[in-house]
Amino acid sequence: MKLSNQFLITITLLITSITFAQEAPHFKPGEDPRQPHQEWKLIENMSDEFEGKKIDEKKWQISGQGWIGRAPGLFLAENISLNNGSLQITTTMLPEPIVKNNKTYTHGGGYVGSRNGMTYGYYECEMKANKTFMSSTFWLINEGKDRLGCDKRTTELDIQESVGQITNDADWMKYFDQTMNSNTHSRNIPEGCEYEKGSSKGKAELGGKAYEDFHVYGVWWKSKDEIIFFLDGKMQSKVTPPADFDIEMYLRMVVETYDWNPVPKDGGMTGSKEDRTTTYNWVRSWQLVDSKN
């Protein structure tokens, strides 16, 4: 069967655009921090275009790795799907409350975590939040269970945490549904280890609600003491974490409940499935390396 020239041109352009899209992180002109002798290398085992029919569980873990969710939100693998080239995590109301570990769960969320970790690099995703009181997030955290000594401490790098419906009257929550809420956390310091406990924040305005449109949320984990946050390819803030961020961390895409943004009286699940779904079009992780040329 002969293929038309127009069809071949279309396919070629499509393949070229896909390839080009993965040559470097999403930066606006003049924002790429790489030097002339450097290039961005895509880290395949921490990146995904979500083009398949089901999530790649060799790359992503969807059961929570022992973390079942903060009550009243329970992580459910059935709430995670791939649809039209996107990863979707849908919030739900459970048919009946479930009691686990003496805690009552009434809602369902979802957890997607990378099986592989990395240190310094650039991490980004294109995400649109759900409209509910539950979260839409993109972040990194270390895993201390197999670590020794002071490396058992916790380091967490929150690139974006938002909600679609604010149910808390606190001043700091006023714009949580329309900002890029970024953070660095240091906690669980083992006894005898001289690391600071605390948090250092970054913030940027989205120009609308987090659920109204897709945004590209990114972070350049430049060094142990310099974190730079990007929104839609533009640098927003630089943060010095409270302790050295030099431990390998793993990606997390999580939809959960927050105890500081409680369930509304109507249960918060009255919207359509689309309204109740957080969508990730892609996630990409990069390392800055010396050019081969």
Curated annotation (Swiss-Prot):
In short, the EC number is 3.2.1.178
Question: Principal localization?
Answer: periplasm
Q: List the disulfide bonds.
A: none
GO molecular-function terms, A-Z:
hydrolase activity, hydrolyzing O-glycosyl compounds
Catalytic activity annotation = Hydrolysis of beta-D-galactopyranose-(1->4)-alpha-L-galactopyranose-6-sulfate linkages in porphyran
Active site per UniProt: 156, 161
Q: Where in the cell is it found?
A: Periplasm
Functionally, this protein is described as follows: Cleaves the sulfated polysaccharide porphyran at the (1->4) linkages between beta-D-galactopyranose and alpha-L-galactopyranose-6-sulfate, forming mostly the disaccharide alpha-L-galactopyranose-6-sulfate-(1->3)-beta-D-galactose. Some longer oligosaccharides of even number of residues are also observed. Inactive on the non-sulfated agarose portion of the porphyran backbone. In contrast to PorA, tolerates the presence of 3-6-anhydro-L-galactose in subsite -2.
Similarity annotation: Belongs to the glycosyl hydrolase 16 family.
Which Pfam family, giving just one, matches this sequence? Glyco_hydro_16
Task: Give the GO cellular component terms, alphabetically.
Answer: periplasmic space
User: Which terms under GO biological process does the entry name?
Assistant: carbohydrate metabolic process
> For substrate, which residues are the binding ones?
67, 70, 156, 161, 256
> What protein is this chain from?
Beta-porphyranase B
Query: Which keywords describe this protein according to UniProt?
Result: Glycosidase, Hydrolase, Periplasm, Signal
Give start-end of the signal peptide. 1-21
- What region holds the GH16 domain? 38-291
Read off the lineage from the record. Bacteria, Pseudomonadati, Bacteroidota, Flavobacteriia, Flavobacteriales
